[in-house]
Each structure stands twice: as structure tokens, then as C-alpha cells.
């Protein structure tokens, strides 16, 4: 987990001539300072930093084309950088190269309220986008825990707490533009709600983790802001009863907007970090969207289901400030959990299974975690079968690294055996390449590799991620 890049990923040469060309073109928007490179060579993954040779702050698609063409001429890797919130090492420059910082490409290019779409640059964050939409009566619902960039969310096929109602980035990106490894720009998709025109290149780039090109524009779906919103918290006597409540809620068709599971250890961490007073038991957070009558009906149904499974009295959060406090605490759960073991790093699992197998998967995982000496809180978007274990390790203790790898492998292999996936929303990055092969098989990975070779024949686009260059 905490090992440097393997020898097969040796750094490539970074010619002085390339640096001179970048500086003559972009001036002060090029940095080789240790601090800037260090900031762009780490993320929220457990891996040691891997610094790029230089960072360039792009301001337009034309800038990115120029950077890519110069790097291609010299055979230097390119790593796109959004907000730095990856949990899988996507941003690490394992072969050196140029980090393209997209944070200054943060404009809303067009809002099409009648069509419920918006086109944005990749550096805008989800919070910035929703702030820009505030007066339109519309919102963009996908909300991973971090305030991630829309470009990064697209590149990792991200989702979040309300995917159970609104889907993931896969369902919500209608089209995009990307700069390929040779500097050409491709535009995929349209603003039409559907299309049967050719290969679905939009879906190819959504989840490509920067390995096929640099995404420069994204068109996403918007949704009307609901008339009524209500949130609630409910504690349960066991993990199994909490999860079964969720499964029954989904199976009877309640259109719940969010349902999050937080185990008792994670609740303790959240209480301390966010100054809450939740019962330190296995807990579900709910949110309901709709009309006043619809929300009341949904809440009543779910409350009855929870009571059948030992749920202890709903605590309601109907005021916007109370809901914000609750969901901010959930979104900060990762950092809260790190405080359970000061100085630790977290190896974070991301399995997702069919909802029919969720209870079995979570219960068997809980048994594994109870037998481990490591603290391992669990949180999850259980409404769509996705949950995360944060395995907290001391990176200086090899035995803890080994134990984390053992637990991680058991959790992933269990999910795959249940027709699930090794990653529901974080992506493959550096950490899950072996699991990708287990999940899909060698022939499927060879097909992915053939696409990569066709679009990026010199392996310049974020090399070392998703799968190895050679079979």
C-alpha cells in the first residue's frame, strides 16, 4: 500500500528543452517549485507522493492542446489534476511528467434550463456549479464526499450519497470534449436526451481516469430543485437490521433521495469531529425529496420499515441548516475516521454488490473486521449496494500494511464472487489493477488495452493507471 512506484514504472527523462518551451509559452503559469510539485504529486490515497517534473496551469482547451503537443514531441507523460481528492493514486506522477492543473478552467459555459442541461469546464467543483445554478431552480445532484471537480468526477465515473435517486456520472454526462495524446480535440455526444449515432464515446471517456485524454468540457443533466426536502437519522441494534431496512425500502419502490449507512465506530468519529450527539450505534441517514405530501408519505413508509427492524425513533432534520449540518458531517466522515488513529493512513475499500446480496456481503465483512487488530469503520451509500471500509494503518508498520491488504483482498473477492465490483465510484487508479483482471478477465482487459494503445500509442496519458501497458 505504502510502497514507491515499482521498477517497471521508472521515471522518464524530462528534457530542459521542454521546460524552456513551456515557460516561453505559459510564463508564470509553469512551476517547478518543490511545494507546487508536492501539492500535485499527492492525493488522498495511502500511497507515497510521486511528484511531477513540472506543473502547468491551463486556462483553455487551446492551452491543453499546446501542452499535450509539446509533451508528445518529447515523450513526456501528462497527468490531469482537478481538486486532488482521489483515493486511488490517480494523480501520482509515477513516471514523472507534466501535471496539467485545471482549476483555472472553472467556467459555466452555458445553462440550458429548458433542456435541463449545463455545459462546464472541468475545473469547476460541484459546489461552485450548484452556486451558479442557485437562481435557476435547478441543481446538479451528484455529490461525492469531497468537493471534487466535475472533470475529476467524470474521469473516475464518480457518484455519491444520492446515486440511489439520481444515478452516477455515467448516467448524467451527456457529452464531453477531450484533448487526445496527439493534441486533437474530440467531441462526444450531444444535448439530446438520447442518440443511437455510432459508438458511445462519451461512456468510453467517463471513467477513463485521464488515460485516454484530457477532458476539457462536460455537458451534464440537471434536475429541478425539489419542493420539499426532509432528512432523518435512525439507529439500529445491528448492522444486519440497518442494511435489511435499506433493502426493503428499495425493493418496495420508495424513491428515497439518499440513504447512508454509518457503523457505530464511524458514528463515534463523526460525533467528535463534527460536534454531534448521535447515538453511537449502527445508523442510517435518510433524505427525502418531492412534494410536501410525497415526502411525508415516503418518510412514513420508511419509518414503519425501520421500526420492524428495531430502528430507534427517527430524529428529523427539516430545517436547511440542520440538514446541512448532518450531511456535512457525513461528507467529512473520511477525515473524522482518520482521527480515530492519529498519524494513520486509510486504505479505503469501494466494493458494490447487487442489492439482493448486500446484507450477506456486509455481515460477512463485519465478521472479518471484528477479528482484525486494526480499526476499520464502515460507511456506505447502501441504497445502491456500495459501501466503504476505512482500514486505518500506521504506514511505518509493515505488518499493518500486510493486514490491510489481506482484509482488502477478502472484501473485494467476496464482492466479485457476488457478481459485484471492486470499485463502485473511486476508480481503479494504482491500487485495484489486479482486482480489475479478477473482475473482468484477461480478454476484457486486453480489449481495454487495445483501445488505450490506439488512442495513446506512446503511453503518455496518465501512465501506470487502470492496467499495465504491456499484457
Annotate each language-model stretch with its function.
Residues 28, 416-428, 453, 457-461:
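Alpha-helix capping/hinge segments and adjacent helical runs
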Amino acid at each position: 500500500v505504502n510502497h514507491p512506484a515499482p521498477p517497471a514504472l521508472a521515471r522518464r527523462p524530462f528534457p530542459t528543452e521542454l521546460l524552456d518551451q513551456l515557460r516561453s509559452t505559459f510564463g508564470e503559469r509553469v512551476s517547478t517549485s518543490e511545494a507546487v510539485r508536492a501539492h500535485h504529486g499527492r492525493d488522498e490515497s495511502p500511497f507515497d507522493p510521486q511528484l511531477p517534473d513540472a506543473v502547468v496551469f491551463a486556462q483553455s482547451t487551446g492551452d491543453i492542446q499546446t501542452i499535450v503537443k509539446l509533451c508528445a514531441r518529447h515523450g513526456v507523460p501528462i497527468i490531469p489534476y482537478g481538486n486532488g481528492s482521489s483515493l486511488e493514486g490517480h494523480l501520482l506522477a509515477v513516471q514523472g511528467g507534466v501535471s496539467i492543473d485545471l482549476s483555472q478552467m472553472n467556467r459555466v459555459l452555458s445553462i440550458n434550463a429548458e433542456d435541463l442541461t449545463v455545459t462546464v469546464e472541468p475545473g469547476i467543483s460541484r459546489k461552485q456549479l450548484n452556486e451558479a445554478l442557485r437562481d435557476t431552480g435547478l441543481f446538479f445532484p451528484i455529490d461525492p464526499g469531497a468537493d471534487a471537480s466535475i472533470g475529476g468526477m467524470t474521469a473516475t465515473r464518480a457518484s455519491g450519497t444520492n446515486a440511489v435517486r439520481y444515478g452516477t456520472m455515467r448516467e448524467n454526462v451527456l457529452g464531453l470534449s477531450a484533448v487526445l495524446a496527439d493534441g486533437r480535440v474530440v467531441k462526444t455526444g450531444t444535448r439530446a436526451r438520447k442518440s443511437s449515432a455510432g459508438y458511445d464515446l462519451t461512456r468510453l471517456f467517463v471513467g477513463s481516469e485521464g488515460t485516454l485524454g484530457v477532458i476539457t468540457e462536460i455537458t451534464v443533466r440537471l434536475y429541478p430543485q425539489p419542493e420539499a426536502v426532509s432528512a432523518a437519522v435512525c439507529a439500529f441494534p445491528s448492522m444486519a437490521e440497518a442494511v435489511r431496512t435499506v433493502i426493503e425500502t428499495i425493493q418496495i419502490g420508495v424513491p428515497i433521495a439518499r440513504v447512508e449507512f454509518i457503523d457505530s465506530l464511524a458514528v463515534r468519529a463523526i460525533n467528535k469531529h463534527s460536534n454531534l450527539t448521535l447515538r453511537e450505534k449502527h445508523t442510517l441517514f435518510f433524505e427525502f425529496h418531492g412534494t410536501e405530501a410525497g415526502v411525508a408519505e415516503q418518510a412514513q413508509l420508511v419509518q414503519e420499515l425501520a421500526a420492524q427492524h428495531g430502528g430507534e425513533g427517527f430524529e428529523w432534520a427539516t430545517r436547511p441548516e440542520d440538514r446541512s449540518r448532518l450531511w456535512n458531517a457525513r461528507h467529512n466522515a473520511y477525515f473524522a475516521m482518520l482521527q480515530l488513529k492519529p498519524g494513520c493512513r486509510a486504505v479505503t475499500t469501494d466494493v458494490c454488490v447487487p442489492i439482493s446480496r448486500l446484507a450477506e456481503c456486509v455481515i460477512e465483512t463485519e465478521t472479518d473486521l471484528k477479528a482484525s487488530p486494526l480499526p476499520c469503520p464502515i460507511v456506505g451509500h447502501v441504497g445502491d449496494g456500495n459501501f466503504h471500509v476505512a482500514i486505518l494503518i500506521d504506514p511505518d508498520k509493515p505488518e499493518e500494511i500486510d493486514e490491510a491488504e489481506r482484509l482488502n483482498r477478502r472484501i473485494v473477492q467476496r464482492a466479485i464472487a457476488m457478481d459485484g465490483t471492486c470499485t463502485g465510484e473511486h476508480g481503479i487508479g494504482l491500487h485495484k489493477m489486479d482486482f480489475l483482471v479478477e473482475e473482468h478477465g484477461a480478454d476484457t482487459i486486453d480489449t481495454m488495452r487495445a483501445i488505450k494503445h490506439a488512442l495513446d500509442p506512446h503511453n503518455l496519458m496518465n501512465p501506470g493507471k487502470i492496467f499495465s501497458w504491456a499484457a
